[in-house]
Structure formats: structure tokens, C-alpha cells
């Protein structure tokens, strides 16, 4: 996907989420300079794989086969072993009208 397509999907999703009465965390809107200046804060975000995720499942046609996700919270498998910390994930998922999300697994 082209960066311009990804940016447009992110803008549309952000608008839709706000219109639905939900607000993404501040890191959703950080610039590259923000990420650089907040390296300590950013470590958990990166290690927990939180943030934007836009996929066409490798099919090359997001409008037909795609999914938008924003991960707000994500636990670690280590937390399950100790039954402490974040034990679940919290994701916002958007599928457009007539868009398919192929069966997949993680």
C-alpha cells in the first residue's frame, strides 16, 4: 500500500472513532520527533505492539480485503504466567461496508 493510502485510512478512521465518542490516546498522534523525544515512554508502546495497524492481508486490495485496527492496550504472555499486569488486549477494529476480513490466525 502507498503511504498516501495509509495516511488517508488513518485520517478517516480517526474521524470515525471521534464521531463515535471515543478518543485515541495521545501517542496515536505523535510525530516522529515526539517518538524520539519520548523514548522511555515509547518503549512500552513499541514492546506491547500498540498503535495503528492497517492490513490488506497481502492481497493488494485494501478496499476489498482489509482491516483497520488500533491497539490501545496489549498484555504480555508473561503476564498470564504470573496472573498480574495487563491480561488482555483492547483493540478498535473497523471494517468498511462491503469490505471482507479474511479468516486468519495469530
Locate predicted features.
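Conserved short histidine dyad/triad with adjacent acidic residue
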Residues: 72-78, 92-106
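A short, N-terminal "cap"/entry segment at the start of jelly-roll beta-barrel domains
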Residues: 1-88
